[in-house]
Amino acid sequence: MPSYRLSHLKQLEAESIHIIREVAVEFENPVMLYSIGKDSSVMVRLAEKAFYPGKVPFPLLHVDSKWKFREMIEFRDSYARENNWGLIVHSNEEAFADGVGPFSHGSQVHTDLMKTQALLQALGKYKFDAAFGGARRDEEKSRAKERIFSFRDRFNQWDPKNQRPELWEIYNTKVHKGESIRVFPISNWTELDIWEYIRLEKIPIVPLYYAKERPVVRVEGNLIMVDDDRMPQEMRARAEMRVVRFRTLGCYPLTGAVESSASTIEEIVAEMMTTTKSERTTRVIDFDQEASMEQKKREGYF
């Protein structure tokens, strides 16, 4: 009798679907965080597969910092509309009204108020008890040591020294009143796995991932794209046209592009075969203080 073996990608897919279904069964009001990026797009496809042909039993939540690339917002709205997803968009309107932004207040204050606090507001407002996130262990060292089921106390804080064992894909989903959980179903995927799955499944993604001539300004070693006129004039005056693409997407003043000629999925996959740096090296928020990402996660960040 011939043996049946799953491919590497299909094994990862099966693990992720198992995790998504586990959360849907164990929690009363889960939500899937949707950042509009490649990892979120893969996670959404996995959720659709997990419950096909039925409807996915939880909504998408996008925490809008008001500083995302314009192409990201256009993609978000068209994708949710065309695929009939329930999409919740939440922003920290009070902080935005006060003029908080990355240019005026710096990356730390902007990220805390417009991303971390906005996320906590949304989780509290809609009383979500579990939130799926698209973080992967190969991205960054604090994420490398985080469990798939990452528990948060009643203050939404993460304690890396108080994590539960996850042996044999058996997950402890019990939480006390007021506690919640962040779940990362693609923790064991790599950036290359993500791109190969996008190619396999023909998943639509934001065009910013493809190389194209774009106006960029060099800021502390990062190529920051000029996306709107909120960028100070003195910075825009230094802009130059370069063929670049983005490996990761976030707020445009805090996300660096990389010089690349990869304009197709096949070329991106080939590029990933030889790259030696994490995509998070182009995210300013990961380096705005010592142990930056771990500290942000302790405070409630994704």
Swiss-Prot record:
Decide whether keyword ATP-binding is in the record. Answer: yes
Query: How does this chain assemble?
Result: Heterodimer composed of CysD, the smaller subunit, and CysN.
Explain the purpose of this protein.
With CysN forms the ATP sulfurylase (ATPS) that catalyzes the adenylation of sulfate producing adenosine 5'-phosphosulfate (APS) and diphosphate, the first enzymatic step in sulfur assimilation pathway. APS synthesis involves the formation of a high-energy phosphoric-sulfuric acid anhydride bond driven by GTP hydrolysis by CysN coupled to ATP hydrolysis by CysD.
Q: Which reaction does it catalyse?
A: sulfate + ATP + H(+) = adenosine 5'-phosphosulfate + diphosphate
Supply the enzyme class, top level.
Answer: transferase
* UniProt keyword annotations, A-Z: ATP-binding, Nucleotide-binding, Nucleotidyltransferase, Transferase
The organism that produces this protein has a lineage beginning with:
Bacteria, Pseudomonadati, Chlorobiota, Chlorobiia, Chlorobiales
Q: What is this protein called?
A: Sulfate adenylyltransferase subunit 2
The metabolic or biological pathway listed in the UniProt record of this protein is: Sulfur metabolism; hydrogen sulfide biosynthesis; sulfite from sulfate: step 1/3
Pfam families xrefs: PAPS_reduct (PF01507)
**What family does this belong to?**
Belongs to the PAPS reductase family. CysD subfamily.
SUPFAM superfamilies referenced in this protein's UniProt entry, alphabetically: Adenine nucleotide alpha hydrolases-like (SSF52402)
MF term (GO), any? sulfate adenylyltransferase (ATP) activity
- Do you know which HAMAP family this protein is assigned to? Sulf_adenylyltr_sub2
Q: Which GO terms describe its biological process?
A: hydrogen sulfide biosynthetic process; sulfate assimilation
The EC number of this protein is 2.7.7.4
